[in-house]
Amino acid sequence: MKLYSLLSVFLVILLATSDSDAFTRNNFPKDFLFGAATSAYQWEGAVAEDGRTPSVWDTFSHTYNRGNLGNGDITSDGYHKYKEDVKLMAEMGLESFRFSISWSRLIPNGRGLINPKGLLFYKNLIKELISHGIEPHVTLYHYDLPQSLEDEYGGWINRKIIEDFTAYADVCFREFGEDVKLWTTINEATIFAIGSYDQGISPPGHCSPNKFINCTSGNSSTEPYLAGHNILLAHASASKLYKLKYKSTQKGSIGLSIFAFGLSPYTNSKDDEIATQRAKAFFYGWMLKPLVFGDYPDEMKRTVGSRLPVFSEEESEQLKGSSDFIGIIHYTTFYVTNKPSPSIFPSMNEGFFKDMGVYMISAANSSFLLWEATPWGLEGILEYIKQSYNNPPIYILENGMPMGRDSTLQDTQRIEFIQAYIGAMLNAIKNGSDTRGYFVWSMIDLYELLSGYTTSFGMYYVNFSDPGRKRTPKLSASWYTGFLNGTIDVATQDTIQLQSNISGSSSL
């Protein structure tokens, strides 16, 4: 590795954009939030400290055959280093920080007694953020169900989860709601149900028997729809509680987030256009149509039939309007076609992708470790939601680019990726989308749920070999700082000199 013994590294980046794409932070409304994100299991570590009990991710990462992906036992050690991280956020100029609460740290048995040390940690974290002028955006659930509830009744495929999730949410609203004004109930609800109960790639690892993944239990033709149904009802129940009991005094907002691929027809044929609409109904409408109109998309009801649960009239009314905003998690875009071609997941005999009945082809020239930007995909998502779902308020809760671990601090490709998506988001806003915030994934290097420590998304490098988990800024941290404080404009052929205070080395 080539070393540069410099106190500062100056890089010149040519940002080639069109005149119409030129923008600065000032082009966005003053109350628009720019931030960065993490999640509890991926950031905190300290999995067996101060009363925390195992979540399903602890079990999954330790017991399932996932190669050398590791686990989140220590990860970035945010539990002990949160003050240092908040200071870095403040230095970066973050306006908001999105994090999740570990249910099993706050309520170790899943219900009942609150863990005072867990409660104190989150109170201190929120206090630290606010003291530095950073708005907390709190996710209640990011894949990490207490293992005790999974063992007791099977977690999200059992309607008992609705009552337990609502009780857990009640504790969070009561204890943190005076200082938290933005709540996301459940993280990327669509891909959570698919990954956990159809594909078996995330806990509890359920899927039908197949030659690709060795799931010990599950039914891919029914369980993802059961889980999705209970996710929606749990969200609606928590939202109803918040609005009846807390909203009038706490003045906050509550929403649900979905994972959204950009989806575009592979050709201009009518068949591909119909296939794309069907894919949007399954990927977006599965969660969004109940939240806005109270029922599932007709395309899903026709295809899935009796395997798709039915909302009662009361449930339908409770769902409508239960999200004050929609959270969008977006990374990449696919072309959609009816014609056979490689799909995003291996073909299986049953499940969500068979029901959807389309083939998906990557629109980006990407590898597992490096994604090409396709910002037009995000712009298309925002336009579609505006037109199809009454233009709800939207927060882009995750967007970012993976790179190989220990590759470089000069992550210029990540900078180009992020600025391209911010530009696309601005275009959508100019066209009427009610988008109100953007969060880079991720604030610092973390334990990535699907790739472990083989990839990193962070704007700060974390040395996972160092017991102290030393943080070092990447160039993207300096770029984001400059963009947020107005010293960097994204404009036509601008030559922008970024100063990154990287001591000793620009490569790792």
Curated annotation (Swiss-Prot):
Its EC number is 3.2.1.21. Disulfide bonds join 207-215. The active site is at residues 188, 398. GO terms for molecular function: beta-glucosidase activity. GO terms for cellular component: plant-type vacuole. Pfam families: Glyco_hydro_1. It catalyses: Hydrolysis of terminal, non-reducing beta-D-glucosyl residues with release of beta-D-glucose. A beta-D-glucoside binds at residues 42, 142, 187-188, 331, 398, 441, 457. Belongs to the glycosyl hydrolase 1 family. This is Beta-glucosidase 10.
